[in-house]
């Protein structure tokens, strides 16, 4: 068990802001906060992993699927949903390599290199790929909630008429209209805030903006998913 990748983005953003604050204000006391900020996740992760390993009577928690698998998957075309979305590649490649983390990592790196070569050879295809991936993830005001509910409700026969109306009927269109409005309103307000914060050169006010833009950059390469954008929307 370890710090989730999305949480790592926020951690890195906070570290960047603290370092810039220390440089600008010559505040050496910030070093203490930096050590705590970096050390606390490591200590807690180690403690949790140790407890789980002890409970499972293992020497250590297996490494599992490498993070490179999610990057490789994020650079693959996906005709079922959209480019870079989940396609079970991470699990498939892990099983193909007999659950060997090292061998899986090598296979994922080969896949990443192949994707990069294809993008480099076909720049227009590359731009189209990332455009579709970016739009499909960040222009979803429902953050994948509606399609997820639909997926998991298709084989249930105990749903109320109200639920059916909002999942499959015209109620779905009403919800989409409401979500489109508040989604646009929040993004517009956030953009204005980010612009004003940059003009004022106030580091503390730029933390949230840095987290959001870090998320944008991170998910250009990582596996895409509408639900991943929800935490940044809250920020």
Segments the model singles out, each with a brief description of its role:
Residues 24-39:
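Membrane-interfacial entry segments at the cytosolic side of transmembrane helices
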Residues 1-4, 14-16, 36-42:
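Membrane-interface alpha helices of multi-pass inner-membrane proteins
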Residues 1, 196-197, 211-226:
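Transmembrane-helix signature of polytopic, lipid-linked glycan biosynthesis machinery
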Residues 37-53:
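Transmembrane signal-anchor helices characteristic of membrane glycosylation enzymes that use polyprenol
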Residues 6-21, 234:
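Transmembrane-embedded, aromatic-rich helix segments that form part
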Residues 52-158:
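Membrane-proximal stem/loop segments at transmembrane-domain junctions that anchor or position
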Residues 132-212:
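Membrane-interface anchor segments at the N-terminal boundary of transmembrane helices
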Residues 16-26, 194-200:
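Structural signal for the C-terminal ends of transmembrane alpha-helices
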């Amino acid at each position: 068990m370890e710090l989730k990748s999305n949480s790592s983005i926020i951690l890195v953003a906070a570290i960047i802001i603290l370092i810039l604050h220390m440089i600008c204000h010559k505040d050496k006391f910030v070093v203490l906060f930096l050590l705590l900020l970096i050390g606390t996740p490591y200590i807690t992760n180690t403690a949790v992993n140790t407890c789980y390993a002890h409970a499972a009577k293992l020497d250590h928690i297996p490494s599992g699927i490498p993070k490179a698998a999610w990057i490789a998957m994020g650079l693959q075309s996906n005709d079922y949903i959209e480019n870079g979305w989940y396609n079970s590649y991470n699990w498939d490649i892990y099983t193909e390599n007999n659950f060997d983390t090292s061998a899986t990592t090598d296979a994922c790196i080969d896949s990443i290199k192949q994707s990069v070569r294809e993008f480099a050879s076909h720049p227009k295809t590359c731009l189209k790929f990332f455009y579709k991936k970016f739009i499909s993830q960040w222009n979803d005001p429902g953050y994948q909630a509606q399609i997820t509910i639909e997926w998991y409700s298709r084989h249930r026969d105990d749903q109320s008429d109200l639920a059916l109306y909002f999942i499959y009927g015209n109620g779905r269109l009403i919800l989409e209209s409401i979500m489109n409005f508040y989604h646009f309103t929040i993004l517009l307000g956030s953009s204005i805030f980010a612009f004003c914060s940059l003009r004022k050169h106030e580091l503390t006010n730029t933390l949230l903006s840095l987290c959001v833009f870090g998320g944008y950059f991170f998910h250009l390469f990582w596996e895409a998913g509408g639900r991943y954008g929800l935490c940044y929307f809250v920020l």
